[in-house]
Amino acid sequence: MFCEQFGLSTAADSTDRGQIRIGKRNVEGGPRQSDITHEAYRVVVGMRGDINDAWSYDAYGQYGTSNLSAVATNDFSIERTARALNVQIDDRVDDDGNPLNPTTFGTPQCVSVVDGTDPACVPYNPFALNGIAADQIGYLQIPLVLKGETTERIVNASVTGDLTNYGIKLPSASTGLMLNFGVEYREELSELLPDGPSQAGDGAGTGGPTTPVNGGYRTNDIFAAARMALLEDKPFAQSLSWEAGYRYSDYSLDFTTDTYKLGLEWTPIEDIRARASYQRSVRVPNVTELFGVQAVGLDGTIDLCASDVSDGETVALTPEECARTGVLPEQYNNIQSNPAAQYNGFVGGNPDLQPETADTLSFGLAFQPSFAPGLRLQIDYFDISIDDAIQNPNADFSLLLCAQTGDPLLCSRIQRDGDGSLWQSNDGFIVDTFQNIGEIATKGIDLDVSYAFDIGAAGRLGLDLVATRLESLEFTPQPGVTYDCAGLYGSICGVPAPEWRHKMDATWRTPWSGIDLTLSWRYFDAVKQDSQDANEFLSFLGTASGQDATDAELGSRSYIDLTGSVTLADKYTLRVGVNNLFDKDPPLNGANACPSGPCNGNTWPQVYDAIGRQIFGLVTIDF
């Protein structure tokens, strides 16, 4: 029965052959662990002063470096496991017929021991009833070591002038034109050095090779900014001013960029200030996005043309749609899905990347009422649009859109192995290197409220709320396909994007000089799995990939933090605290909604506290 469901005959004279893949998780060797250390250093040397009554200068040099050291343990070596599974009876004898090794003669031994290629090999029987022995673990497990360094060097010089003294001002204002202009040199270098086993992808739980990175770039900038009052001390215009700025950057990557801003600020009365601004900004690709070595590793979460063949499951797409993704007629309904929802991608850097550009429109209002001393409120609306966004195309997206549209560019990214699989060998993958693709647009509101007041002999209490209301987070990876990820997470939307998040602090400035206590509440609104959204593209992909309502929503999360600080002699500050005081676990979700990379350990450490309660200490010395 087992053979027949794969189309294999069990007749005595049958010559049918088939492949079987057996997987086993290494539970006996203990959980995989990582010991990660970051060390950062920064040195700034500068000088500033007055040139005359109207002009001043500011110049500085900065050097910063961040070092990474990571050691992963309890990973099985793929190479050693293969040797340990390749076993034969030791039947070696000398010319007289005597055993070459009486101790091992007649016992199971690794072929690599017998032929001398690896004398240290220990046979491994994954089906043994009594588990795995210590000597087997000692041979099979290897440490994986990663070293890295990022370095930044900056030299900046600028002059600032108040041209009011030269009479360059409007008759309607007493403050004249303010100017700032200067030059800057910046150098960014990054190096990542995995050890040999890491580069070879020899760790069984790593999902593929960790490739080295070595690269950098330099930029020479010139910049200028101006600010000028239009009205001052007028009815309903205590002040009205404009500002503008421009920066030209010449990169060693053979491109240049222009960024600029325009702004208007109006203070009708002392208690209220309104502002509006437009900015053109750029983000250049970082060193990893540019120079990361390209290799096959875990990336996507689905293959819509694969299914659980052993259970007779049928695929989600039609034969015609699967053919567009490279499936041969005889492979249709015969491609085994990955039980861990992990598929191969060809990932890495792209030296041909160009900067992404963003246009930001913002409006803000600040309210600091004189009738309520200590109260301050700021609210800002933002509308950001990004073109030529630097992203991975998203393997799941490429597969679905290729199947639906037959787009030649999308379909060319899909490379199946000889059996049609995208995971059973490194010959099957979806190209997912960094590209300048599509558009991203987001809108929302930032809120900042604070209120500080005396509490008599007990000192002073300060309340602060910083919150963001996310109205939309739209992605347009190609014309005609747009989806909004606000309030969603999953295999397409990726990292959870709560529609509301905030941090609220209550700070008690005690009557004992220099001693403060702060209690903080961090909150993240619930998010839905993207497959549950009404968007046709997202819902179809979720249904086709087997996502269900099991983890349709990650519930809201609250974290409480406590921090205390003591300042001595106005220069020494000791700060200690506990983050996630009540050791709240992060929300978990299944593999189908957990893309490799941003989703780690079935949760999202970019948003939620993944390692529980954390205790920290910090010493600051001012001199």
Predicted regions and their residues:
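Surface-exposed, low-complexity loop segments enriched in small/polar and acidic residues
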Residues: 1-220, 279-355, 380-446, 479-494, ...
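Transmembrane beta-strands of outer-membrane beta-barrel proteins
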Residues: 57-59, 177-183, 238-244, 260, ...
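Transmembrane beta-strands of outer-membrane beta-barrel pores
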Residues: 61-67, 163, 183-191, 230, ...
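Solvent-exposed loop/turn segments connecting transmembrane beta-strands
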Residues: 216, 249-258, 449
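C-terminal beta-barrel architecture of Gram-negative outer-membrane proteins
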Residues: 297, 459-567, 582
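C-terminal beta-signal and adjacent terminal beta-strands/loops
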Residues: 387, 471-472, 522-538, 565-623
